[in-house]
Regions:
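C-terminal catalytic domains of large/alpha subunits in multi-subunit enzymes
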Residues: 1-123
Length: 123
């Protein structure tokens, strides 16, 4: 499996109401995107799920979490309460293609699907 060691992100977070919680939301979104990129896969065999439990269905844990460098750009949203914006969703959406692009750049392999499995990148 691919080991992601560092992810850097910059995000417009509106007005930060709680910096620690905001960073936690960014890190959580990154973990979800990481899972989608290299871990989470439903395996079916003749229509039957072969990995129906968390024992078999891989999810990222704290041990899989990369170092996160996060820059929070504060541009308050005038129409939102206290100027806040959603924080956890954007990294989840952007991290998956960023990891796929990094693997493609490192290997030169066409990677038409996620999650990217070891057999997809073995040379």
């Amino acid at each position: 499996m691919v080991k992601v060691i560092q992810i850097a992100t910059a995000q417009d977070v509106g007005r930060v109401l709680n910096p620690i919680a905001a960073l936690g939301q960014i890190e959580g979104g990154i973990a979800q995107g990481l899972g989608l990129a290299v871990m989470e896969e439903i395996v079916l065999d003749n229509g039957k799920m072969r990995n129906p439990s968390f024992t078999d269905y891989l999810l990222p844990t704290a041990l899989d979490a990369p170092q996160v460098i996060a820059v929070m750009i504060e541009e308050p949203e005038p129409q939102a309460p206290l100027g806040a914006k959603g924080i956890g969703e954007p990294p989840c959406i952007s991290v998956t293609p960023a990891i796929a692009a990094a693997i493609r750049n490192a290997t030169g392999r066409d990677l038409p699907r996620v999650p990217i499995r070891p057999q997809d990148i073995c040379l």
